[in-house]
UniProtKB/Swiss-Prot annotation:
It is linked to Schizophrenia: A complex, multifactorial psychotic disorder or group of disorders characterized by disturbances in the form and content of thought (e.g. delusions, hallucinations), in mood (e.g. inappropriate affect), in sense of self and relationship to the external world (e.g. loss of ego boundaries, withdrawal), and in behavior (e.g bizarre or apparently purposeless behavior). Although it affects emotions, it is distinguished from mood disorders in which such disturbances are primary. Residues 1-25 are annotated as: Involved in targeting to the mitochondrion. Interacts with DAO (D-amino acid oxidase); the interaction is direct, can occur in the presence or absence of FAD or substrate bound to DAO, and results in a complex containing two DAO homodimers and two DAOA monomers. Interacts with DDO (D-aspartate oxidase); the interaction is direct. Interacts wih SOD1; the interaction is direct. Interacts with MSRB2; the interaction is direct. This is D-amino acid oxidase regulator. Residues 138-153 are annotated as: Interaction with DAO. It comes from Homo sapiens (Human). Pfam families: DAOA. It is found in: Cytoplasm, Cytosol; Golgi apparatus; Mitochondrion. GO terms for biological process: D-amino acid metabolic process; positive regulation of protein catabolic process. The keyword Cytoplasm applies.
């Protein structure tokens, strides 16, 4: 997958600078460090391997062509996998991690929508609704239905 994203030449350049090991990729957190100064010499590489995260400091990182390939591949991933999500967990996150993140975004949106729908109609509180249902059923004493509420508790 990386060969497709970055091209064979750029992958060789990248591989010569950092050892990838497993494809549980190393995500480079450049933006935090270089937001103040583009000439910062330090950057942090976060490596995730089998659930454990180790943070290592790489000395002497400067903005070079490898950097451009990282950003290009991140944009490519964002466009191809989930263009509607503005943030991905890491530039080269595994597909499971990306889809998990997208799922969380969808669930959050869904939850917000449902909460909004539930809170939209506050004119008829839950208690009054129960009372109305109870009185209606009392009038129709021959029909004993279970009283259920459609509102979210």
């Amino acid at each position: 997958m990386l060969e497709k994203l970055m091209g064979a030449d750029s992958l060789q350049l990248f591989r010569s600078r950092y050892t990838l090991g497993k494809i549980y990729f190393i995500g480079f957190q450049r933006s935090i460090l270089l937001s103040k100064s583009e000439n910062s010499l330090n950057s942090i590489a976060k490596e995730t391997e089998e659930g454990r995260e180790t943070v290592t400091r790489k000395e002497g990182w400067k903005r070079r062509h490898e950097d451009g390939y990282l950003e290009m591949a991140q944009r490519h991933l964002q466009r191809s996998l989930c263009p509607w999500v503005s943030y991905l967990p890491q530039p080269y996150a595994e597909l499971e991690e990306v889809s998990s993140h997208v799922g969380k975004v969808f669930m959050a949106r869904n939850y917000e929508f449902l909460a909004y729908e539930a809170s939209k109609d506050r004119r008829q509180p839950l208690e009054r609704m129960w009372t109305c249902n109870y009185n209606q059923q009392k009038d129709q004493s021959c029909n004993h239905k279970e009283i259920t509420s459609t509102k979210a508790e």
